[in-house]
Amino acid sequence: MRMYYSRLKLASVLGVCLLGLLLCLPNGMRKPFPSIPWRQIHLGLDLRGGSYLLMQVDLKSLTHDRLQTLAENTRDTLLKSQLGYQNINVDADKNTVSFQPRDAAEADTDVATLDKLPRVVPNEFSVKKQDDGTIALVLSADAIKARAREAVTQSIEIVRRRIDGTGAVDPEITRQGDDRIVVELPGISDPERIKALLGTTAKMTFRLVDSNPLHATYPPPGVSLVPMANPAEGGPLPVFDHVDVDGTDLTNAGAVIDQQTGEWAVSFSFDSVGTRAFSSVTQTNVGKRFAIVLDNKVIEAPVIRTPITGGNGQITGGFDAQKATDLALMLRAGALPAPLSVVEQRSIGPSLGADSIRAGILSLGVGFLLVVVFMVLFYGRFGWYADIALLANLVLMVAILSLFEATLTLPGMAGMLLTLGMAVDANILINERIREEVARGRTPLAAMQTGFERATSTIVDSNATAFLAHVMLFVFGTGPVRGFALTITIGIATTLFTTLLLSRMLMARWYARTRPASLPV
């Protein structure tokens, strides 16, 4: 026990405790104090109130879009290879693109040519000659699943960028299952703007308009009738399916006021790839209409007056300030790979959150008070030392959560309460071991030394096992499970510190001052 008499060790342990207390203070202050690090615990949805959105990724739309792209690539490849075809069909139910060769003798050549098409993932599709003579490109089930996983992961990142752009504080965005995303928005009781932002795919393309007036009624293959975003501007336009410039090549977008009209507009700029493509199409199609299509609706279709080579442009579509800002935000964040739909929405009022906070603090306070009384009644002075260690444990837990600006939820508060129980177990084990050594007739110093040594290995083993288990919960869990696991994991670390260092040091310093003939246990 003499090694714990060191003033340096005493100062180190007390310094950690004082630092923890300092980090806790901002949680009880409304305004920053210059000499105190200003980091606070953020309250989760169940404590602060706010909105909960459960959104589903439309994976069928994702597959359909890929089939449409595959059909377009098939058409272009056959034309370039001078291979005739009839009726390219897309069957989303069977995940196939099929066509009838113009000449049955060219079927094998068709298969060999189309088999060289680029694949997004390995073995994405196979090219087969059917019994009826048609050629079919079939998406594989594994490729569809891989694309779905990638789409959900990509959607989460884009959702996060869009929400961050609105200034929302502490949003929580997690995956649920194979095709769902949970969005928690603390402090936002009316998430209508967020829903509108997330419900828009924001897939922008730039395509030429077919100038043949007959095609406005009967569009040929490769041309689609695309409705106007503003129906007052006219009926659907015949737009070529071929995408001349893709919105993924955008590098920036912002809401501006048009200097000529005084109306709100969205300015944009392309990267080098988009700049070259935009320059090429505007140079070779002067006098033609160029449609800006957002989510399969034409925002506007201006006539190309002169080549645009600078890689910058502007979209005007009768926007107000909010719509222009939101569109620019969505373009900066990127297009969603597939549409999102809200399948569940809940709102938690701030009064309910305040009730949860009061209930959580009350449970922690009552639990801590009962522990204090129990330890003092059963272990006397050493019980008081255990209570001091428990208080320091709670302070250090709050300090670490504040340092990392973690989000505290009701399950997290339950984890803190459970941690106090685990810390009590450790202190009880130490005191019982000391009692056993006293009963065997050992001197006070020997009883304390041996009692701690016998208890330490058990405490470390049990806490190490619990630590690993809760780390796994944090890594693989979601939502409330992660909050619970986080506080338990932090609590285990602080429990080992306060139990094996602080409480032992308090006992050792007391013994060094008093040299008692017997121990108060």
Curated annotation (Swiss-Prot):
One of its GO terms (molecular function) is protein-transporting ATPase activity. Keywords: Cell inner membrane, Cell membrane, Membrane, Protein transport, Translocation, Transmembrane, Transmembrane helix, Transport. GO terms for cellular component: plasma membrane. The keyword Cell division does not apply. It is found in: Cell inner membrane. Belongs to the SecD/SecF family. SecD subfamily. Forms a complex with SecF. Part of the essential Sec protein translocation apparatus which comprises SecA, SecYEG and auxiliary proteins SecDF-YajC and YidC. This is Protein translocase subunit SecD. It comes from Acetobacter pasteurianus (strain NBRC 105184 / IFO 3283-01).
